[in-house]
Amino acid sequence: MILALWALLAVIQLSAQSGYGINPVFDGKLIPSSRIKETYINGTQLAPYKLRVFRSVKFTATPAELSRIQALLLEDGKGAEDRQTEYTGGVLTYALFRFRAEVHSSRYDMPVEGNKYLCLQVFPKETRYDVTLVYMSGDATLDELKQLFKN
């Protein structure tokens, strides 16, 4: 039973953010899973924030790894409705992309509009980079998320 629950959770995680080139980072295929700290939250815990899914990965990357991650993320960002990026010394240190999403209401299984977000934050450290990559989906607007993260 527990194994079935874990398998279901894995399928939900994959389907929640399918279609993004950055997915190999979340799946531990670009950065070894042993170097990644992952957080995954869904359901009622996120309701006060108008989100359905929150998934983040944190890790330390080499310059080559960061370059690959940035290329994947920027390619995904081409399809975004809203984009915010910041560079420091030629390195992408902040990115926030908002995509429109069709999600299904759990109550009626009817399509409803929502948002999907990909966020990147990079902190340079001597010869490596501390990286946080976040995927979120829900009804929260960009302004609401900005307020949430300010507090």
What is each residue range found by the language model?
Residues 1-22:
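Bacterial Sec-dependent N-terminal signal peptides
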Residues 18-67:
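Early exported N-terminus immediately downstream of N-terminal targeting peptides
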Residues 25-29, 72, 148:
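Residues that form generic nucleotide/phosphate-binding pockets
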Residues 33-41, 80-84, 133-140:
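Short, exposed beta-strand "edge-strand" segments with a Pro/Gly-rich flavor and a Y/T-containing core
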Residues 53-112:
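Mature extracytoplasmic domains of secretory-pathway proteins
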Residues 92-94, 112-118, 128-130:
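Short, surface-exposed coil-to-beta transition loops
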Residues 127-151:
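C-terminal partner/receptor-binding element of secreted or periplasmic proteins
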